[in-house]
């Protein structure tokens, strides 16, 4: 007889990151269905999805709700802020976050599996190409948030080593879509 493991999906399907959250939810749901359909596994995964709706405080509330229901494995939290928001709750309850999104690095918790890449892993190859194709002057624009700050720090260092120049460094609110 297969035993059941409760898992949680903490993914916003509304708000700024709804496209990412909806795709992640669809992918996770498909993967969980495949796992549960495989008779070789001695377990099934029982899923509970919480939709924080893109509100930072709702991630912590959702994580606590999942853990109070017995969930010890949580998948999701799209942003660094949402991940950081729930780490104290995870650590207090001995639960594990499976964090698949890119993150800024320089963080370590025994209660988080960091599965996504860091800015240096994508920016360095991109900047090598951009420096050759477009020259050594750049404008660095990012979200006023740890991901934007860290990405621009890496970009600035690469440009400096290459003898390039940062013409502008600007940060905008998360969710900004209009630029003039």
Language model features with spans:
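Beta-alpha junction/loop-to-helix N-cap segments that form part of ligand/metal-binding clefts
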Residues: 23, 38-105
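A short, Lys/Arg-enriched amphipathic alpha-helix followed by its capping loop at the start of a domain
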Residues: 27-41
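Short beta-strand elements in bilobed, periplasmic/extracellular small-molecule ligand-binding domains
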Residues: 37-54, 109-111, 159-176
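Gly/Ser/Thr-rich loops at beta-strand to alpha-helix junctions
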Residues: 14, 78-81, 144-149
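Extracellular glycoside hydrolase catalytic/binding regions
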Residues: 95-125
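An alpha-beta-alpha
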Residues: 115-171
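Extracytoplasmic "Venus flytrap"
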Residues: 2-4, 8-29, 50-52
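Alpha-helical structural signal in soluble globular domains
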Residues: 31-35, 85, 89, 93, ...
């Amino acid at each position: 007889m297969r035993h059941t493991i409760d898992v949680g999906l903490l993914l916003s399907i509304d708000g700024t990151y709804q496209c990412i959250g909806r795709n992640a939810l669809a992918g996770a749901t498909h993967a969980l269905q495949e796992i549960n359909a495989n008779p070789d596994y001695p377990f099934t995964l029982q899923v509970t999805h919480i939709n924080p709706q893109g509100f930072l405080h709702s991630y912590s509330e959702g994580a606590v709700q999942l853990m109070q229901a017995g969930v010890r494995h949580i998948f999701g939290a799209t942003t660094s802020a949402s991940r950081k928001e729930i780490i104290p709750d995870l650590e207090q309850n001995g639960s594990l976050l499976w964090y698949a999104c890119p993150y800024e690095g320089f963080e370590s918790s025994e209660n988080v599996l960091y599965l996504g890449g860091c800015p240096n892993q994508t920016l360095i190859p991109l900047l090598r190409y951009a420096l050759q194709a477009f020259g050594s002057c750049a404008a660095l624009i990012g979200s006023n948030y740890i991901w934007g700050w860290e990405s621009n720090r890496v970009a600035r260092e690469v440009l400096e080593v290459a003898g390039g120049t940062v013409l502008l460094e600007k940060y905008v609110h998360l969710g900004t879509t209009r630029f003039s």
